[in-house]
UniProtKB/Swiss-Prot annotation:
Protein name: rRNA 2'-O-methyltransferase fibrillarin
Molecular function via GO: histone H2AQ104 methyltransferase activity; RNA binding; rRNA methyltransferase activity; U6 snRNA 2'-O-ribose methyltransferase activity
Transferase listed as a keyword: yes
Family, per entry: Belongs to the methyltransferase superfamily. Fibrillarin family.
Superkingdom of this protein's organism: Eukaryota
Length: 323
């Protein structure tokens, strides 16, 4: 036998368990599934130790060797997964209906409206309090502008239990599912998406979540779906179109109650790729003001998104009472 050659195939070698590409390897199984920019924990070290660049030991599906307590940093054991065999504490965030899971690393989570169901392969965690078992779903800020804004410290998000939300640019329903968790069974999410391919996924999400009403239609023509959508408390928009402020304004005029709120995600590139992002954001804010939309807060989404900002404001604010 050659010196330095192990007959057992070198567990933990370059491609095997905990190696560089195998189980719990390079940020794949047990990492954040390539969760852009090294997953949740920032740049990460390419995921040795079962996805250190992920949520320290994985944040996506438990992968092989997961819940059995192995899986080198998978879900149940090894070096720190989402639960990692330790007690995790879930505490309420200052935004109502949103929670923080405190473990080895903190994560933003929402209370799962449909326990036992993942929507896009996100990690779930169950917390038992006496007889009551509550399941939470991890909310990845690299895949959701709202989560990025919350972790970026936005002052008000206006999406809370019991409210009605018109969500423009719903895509496959990843963020919509978390909004559905937040507003709960008393609230409603009207999810508008133009692409039929994404719309199919959105409809599948809505089948299990009774508070989501999918609308497969162009948000530029709100009159086409006015029979489906009632008055709402909040409009959220992530449409990435050059005329997106006009699109939001049209929908606000149709469906947003006076004194209601809007949350708009602006991608500078989509509006004017030649101008500086700050100039684009300022121009969009000006357009909003001309449409009876009063911006109250603006926030960039670094480090989760480049050249993105979220603008939060109020629609047709009630006139100030003169004393």
């Amino acid at each position: 036998m050659r010196p330095g050659f192990s007959p057992r195939g070198g567990r933990g070698g370059f491609g095997d368990r905990g190696g560089f590409g195998g189980r719990g390897g390079f940020g794949d199984r047990g990492g954040f599934r390539g969760g852009s920019r090294g997953g949740f924990g920032g740049r990460g070290r390419g995921g040795d130790r079962g996805g250190r660049g992920g949520f320290r030991g994985g944040f996506s599906s438990p992968g092989r060797g997961g819940p059995r307590g192995g899986g080198r940093g998978g879900f149940g054991g090894g070096r720190g997964g989402f639960g990692a065999g330790r007690k995790v504490i879930v505490e309420p965030h200052r935004h109502e209906g949103i929670f923080i899971c405190r473990g080895k690393e903190d994560a933003l989570v929402t209370k799962n409206l449909v326990p036992g169901e993942s929507v896009y392969g996100e990690k779930r965690i169950s917390v038992e309090d006496g007889e009551v078992k509550t399941e939470y779903r991890a909310w990845n800020p690299f895949r959701s502008k709202i989560a990025a804004a919350i972790l970026g410290g936005v002052d008000q998000i206006h999406i809370k239990p019991g409210v009605k939300v018109l969500y423009l640019g719903a895509a496959s329903g990843t963020t919509v599912s978390h909004v559905s968790d937040v507003v709960g069974p008393e609230g409603l999410v009207y999810a508008v998406e133009f692409s039929h391919r994404s719309g199919r996924d959105l409809i599948n999400v809505a089948k299990k979540r009774t508070n989501i009403i999918p609308v497969i239609e162009d948000a530029r023509h709100p009159h086409k779906y006015r029979i489906l959508v009632g008055m709402v408390d909040v409009v959220f928009a992530d449409v990435a179109q050059p005329d997106q402020t006009r699109i939001v304004a049209l929908n606000a005029h149709n469906f947003l109650k006076n004194g209601g709120h809007f949350v708009i995600s602006i991608k500078a590139n989509c509006i004017d790729s030649t101008a500086a992002p700050e100039a684009v954001f300022a121009a969009e804010v000006k357009k909003m003001q001309q449409e009876n939309m009063k911006p109250q807060e603006q926030l960039t989404l670094e480090p989760y998104e480049r050249d993105h900002a979220v603008v939060v404001g109020i629609y047709r604010p009630p006139p100030k009472q003169k004393k």
